[in-house]
């Protein structure tokens, strides 16, 4: 697992460097996962393989992180998924994007305007 984590960290750092070179402002988004699927992974595994790498890069590079992994609006509503918990279906995606765009507007990352509006989703 250590090698995998190191590879993930290296790849993420390359992606961040690429964005910075292009003058882009990246942000990290961890999408929701159903509670049934979450039970398949220990908290220690999720922390070590995913969260520690993303949290570290977010902190070191001052990149906003939106972690919806255990978002209750999504975790227990299994009809939002098309595959049991990893992939949101059409309705789940629409609900997630409304929530996510609302957070981006609330945090001042994007403006709520007529071109990009939560209400249009």
What residue spans do the PLM features occupy?
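Conserved, well-ordered alpha-helix/loop/beta-strand core segments that scaffold catalytic motifs
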Residues: 1-71
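Flexible, active-site-adjacent loop/turn segments at secondary-structure boundaries
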Residues: 35, 79, 86
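Short amphipathic alpha-helical patches
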Residues: 39-43, 81, 120
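Generic intrinsically disordered, low-complexity segments enriched for polar/acidic and small residues
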Residues: 63-65, 78, 93
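Noncatalytic linker/hinge segments flanking ATPase motor cores
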Residues: 67-74, 106-112
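Short helix/strand-capping connector loops at secondary-structure junctions
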Residues: 73-83
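Histidine-centered active-site loop/cap adjacent to the catalytic His
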Residues: 82-121
């Amino acid at each position: 697992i250590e090698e995998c984590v190191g590879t993930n960290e290296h790849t993420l750092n390359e992606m961040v460097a690429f964005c910075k070179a292009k003058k882009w402002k990246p942000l990290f988004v961890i999408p929701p996962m159903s509670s049934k699927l979450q039970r398949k992974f220990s908290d220690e595994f999720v922390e070590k393989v995913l969260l520690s790498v993303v949290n570290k890069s977010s902190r070191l590079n001052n990149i906003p992180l939106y972690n919806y992994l255990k978002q209750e609006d999504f975790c227990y509503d299994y009809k939002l998924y098309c595959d049991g918990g990893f992939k949101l279906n059409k309705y789940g995606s629409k609900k997630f994007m409304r929530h996510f765009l609302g957070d981006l507007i609330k945090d001042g990352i994007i403006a709520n305007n007529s071109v990009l509006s939560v209400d249009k989703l």
